[in-house]
């Protein structure tokens, strides 16, 4: 909500001031004041939690990391999350796509960009989370989001770049924002489906984060280079690569669902939970 409100205020400032450079200056001053106020407020509002940092806590264990990676389904979940994040980051380029390919009005592009980045999250996250709970399978919901995202990406590629069709393209951008944000909001949830023991769950989540957020290392440099070299023709390439990531993500999720069915069916889950309960009970008895 905060991002949407601040973003709309920024867009309003830019739209209200005729000189773009002055508008940006005023916007930056506004943001600086907001950050300064929040910084001062945090000193008084954020409590000091005693013992928040445990100096005796066990450090990173390579053995646990290897065990987490070897756990059935973890690799598929990690690569799927990598693809989810890659497609999610690719949605950033739908804003310049509207500007450069459709010559869309700047204010329209700003509003659509804000809705895609912030506003859609108010709906997509809860809706997709509800679906995942209803179906009892985040992986299936993410798979569906991938399929819808691929369909929209194909629409971006084949849609004629007619300025009169800017509103239709903007609608596709919002739909794409919904599917990508929705998938991203539950992107790490498949870990809960593969019944990772709690003693290594944190390590597995860390591995997922390292692999999943890796697109940040290269994707913007890559796509930016394509735009510099090819101009508006680059968007066909960018959306093509986004489709590639989506297809790879679908394959990984299908393999993950097969792994879940093979290793973590109802009977297997019961046995795993019984074994873990026995292990915990044995540890408590020893203590």
PLM features: what roles do these ranges have?
Residues 32-53, 252-257:
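C-terminal membrane-cytosol helix-exit motif in multi-pass small-molecule transporters
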Residues 195-231:
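A late C-terminal transmembrane helix in Major Facilitator Superfamily
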Residues 1-15, 209-219:
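Glycine-rich segments within core transmembrane alpha-helices of 12-TM secondary carriers
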Residues 124-137, 227-228:
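Helix-to-loop junctions at the C-terminal end of transmembrane segments
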Residues 138-190:
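C-terminal transmembrane helical hairpin of 12-TM major facilitator-type secondary transporters
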Residues 49-78, 274-277:
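Juxtamembrane intracellular "pre-TM" segments in multi-pass secondary transporters
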Residues 72-126, 184, 189, 219-220:
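Extracytoplasmic gate region of multi-pass secondary transporters
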Residues 19-32, 222-246:
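A membrane-interface helix-boundary motif in multi-pass transporters
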